[in-house]
C-alpha cells in the first residue's frame, strides 16, 4: 500500500514539475505582448520557434506603437476577432471604414510560415489575402477551435491570459463577414520586457 502511495506522490511531483517548466517557458517577457483592451489586458505569448519572421515583424510594430488605437475591424462570433490594419484601422488617426482590413504596414509582406500547430481557442494567427505570402501586420485571435485553418495560416502565438476580455470584443455582422460598426480597439500594445 505504501508503494502505491509513494508511486502516486512521485507521479504528482513529476506532473507538477512539468507544469512549472511549461509555465516558466510561457513567461518569456521578450515574446509576450500585452494588449490593453476596454475590458482588460490580454497577454499573447509569441512563438518565434514557429514563425520567426512574423514574430519579429509584430514585435517591431508593437515597439513602434503601430498597433495603438487599431480597430478590431472584423469580429465573427464563434470564430475570431481580427485586428492589426495599421494603415487604415487606426481609430485615433486616419481610420478609414471603407478600407479597413485591406492595409498593412510599411514593411514588406512576409512569406508563409505554416506549421503543424493547430488553431484552437486562443490561438493567434496572421491574416492574409488569398496569396499565402501576403501576411503583414494583421492578426486574429480565435474564439473557438478552427481546424479548417490548420496548415493554411501562420500561427504566431496564443492568449495566455485575458481571454475573458477577448470574448467581450464587440462582434460584427455575420451578414457582412464580421464587419464591425464603431469597433473596439487595441488601446495600447506593449512588449512585456519593455515595461520592466
Curated annotation (Swiss-Prot):
It catalyses: [protein]-peptidylproline (omega=180) = [protein]-peptidylproline (omega=0). It holds the Pfam family Pro_isomerase. Belongs to the cyclophilin-type PPIase family. It comes from Brucella suis biovar 1 (strain 1330). This is Probable peptidyl-prolyl cis-trans isomerase. Residues 1-26 form the signal peptide. The gene is ppi. One of its GO terms (biological process) is protein folding. Its EC number is 5.2.1.8. Keywords: Isomerase, Periplasm, Rotamase, Signal.
Amino acid at each position: 500500500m505504501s508503494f502505491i502511495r509513494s508511486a502516486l506522490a512521485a507521479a504528482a511531483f513529476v506532473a507538477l514539475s512539468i507544469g512549472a517548466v511549461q509555465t516558466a517557458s510561457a513567461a518569456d517577457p521578450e515574446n509576450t505582448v500585452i494588449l490593453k483592451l476596454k475590458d482588460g489586458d490580454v497577454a499573447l505569448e509569441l512563438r518565434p520557434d514557429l514563425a520567426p519572421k512574423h514574430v519579429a515583424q509584430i514585435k517591431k510594430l508593437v515597439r513602434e506603437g503601430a498597433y495603438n488605437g487599431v480597430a478590431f475591424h472584423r469580429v465573427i462570433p464563434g470564430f475570431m476577432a481580427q485586428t492589426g490594419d495599421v494603415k487604415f484601422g487606426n481609430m485615433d488617426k486616419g481610420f478609414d471604414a471603407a478600407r479597413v482590413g485591406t492595409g498593412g504596414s510599411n514593411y514588406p509582406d512576409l512569406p508563409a510560415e505554416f506549421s503543424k500547430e493547430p488553431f484552437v481557442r486562443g490561438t493567434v494567427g496572421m491574416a492574409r489575402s488569398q496569396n499565402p505570402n501576403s501576411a503583414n501586420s494583421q492578426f486574429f485571435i480565435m474564439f473557438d477551435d478552427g481546424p479548417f485553418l490548420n496548415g493554411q495560416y501562420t500561427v504566431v502565438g496564443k492568449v495566455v491570459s485575458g481571454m475573458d476580455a477577448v470574448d467581450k470584443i464587440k462582434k460584427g455582422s455575420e451578414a457582412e463577414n464580421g464587419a464591425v460598426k464603431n469597433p473596439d480597439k487595441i488601446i495600447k500594445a506593449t512588449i512585456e520586457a519593455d515595461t520592466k
